[in-house]
C-alpha cells in the first residue's frame, strides 16, 4: 500500500508546524529593604504565588527550570588577573538589588518572555532582567569546537 494513501485512508493530516521556541533567562533581583518593609507574612504569600505560578508554567512547557539563590552574603566572587586568582566575599556590585534567583523560560520571542516574567511577584519588589539564551551549538560550530 502506498504510504500517502495509507495516511489518507486513516484521515491523517500533517501537523501544523510550530513556531520555533527560544530560551530566555529571567534573572530575579530583589531589594531586601523593600521586602522587609512589607507586612508580616506578605513575602511568604508572594513565594507561594510564585511557586504555584512556576508549577503552572512548567506544566505548560514554558518554564524549563528555576532556582532561588542563597543570601548574597554567602557568595564568593572569583577573578583571575595576570595569572593570580582573587576570591572575595559577596557580590561585586554595590547595589540595593541583589540576584536572588533565576527562571529559564521557553517562549516564542522576547515579548512573550517578558510577559511571563512580569507575572512573577518579584518585579514589584525588585527587578527581573530577561535575556535571550545564546545557542551554544551555533557557537560551537562558529568557533570549530
Predicted regions and their residues:
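Conserved, structured core segments of small domains
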Residues: 2-7, 11-145
Amino acid at each position: 500500500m502506498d504510504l500517502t494513501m495509507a495516511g489518507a485512508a486513516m484521515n491523517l493530516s500533517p501537523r501544523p508546524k510550530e513556531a520555533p521556541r527560544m530560551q530566555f533567562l529571567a534573572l530575579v533581583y530583589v531589594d531586601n529593604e523593600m521586602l522587609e518593609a512589607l507586612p508580616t507574612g506578605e513575602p511568604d504569600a508572594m513565594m507561594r504565588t510564585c511557586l504555584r505560578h512556576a508549577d503552572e508554567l512548567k506544566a505548560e512547557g514554558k518554564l524549563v527550570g528555576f532556582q532561588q539563590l542563597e543570601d548574597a552574603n554567602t557568595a564568593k566572587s572569583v577573578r583571575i588577573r595576570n595569572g593570580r586568582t582573587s576570591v572575595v566575599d559577596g557580590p561585586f556590585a554595590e547595589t540595593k538589588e541583589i540576584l536572588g534567583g533565576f527562571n529559564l523560560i521557553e517562549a516564542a520571542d522576547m515579548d512573550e518572555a517578558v510577559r511571563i516574567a512580569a507575572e512573577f511577584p518579584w518585579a514589584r519588589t525588585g527587578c527581573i532582567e530577561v535575556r535571550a539564551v545564546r545557542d551554544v551549538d551555533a557557537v560551537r560550530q562558529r568557533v570549530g569546537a
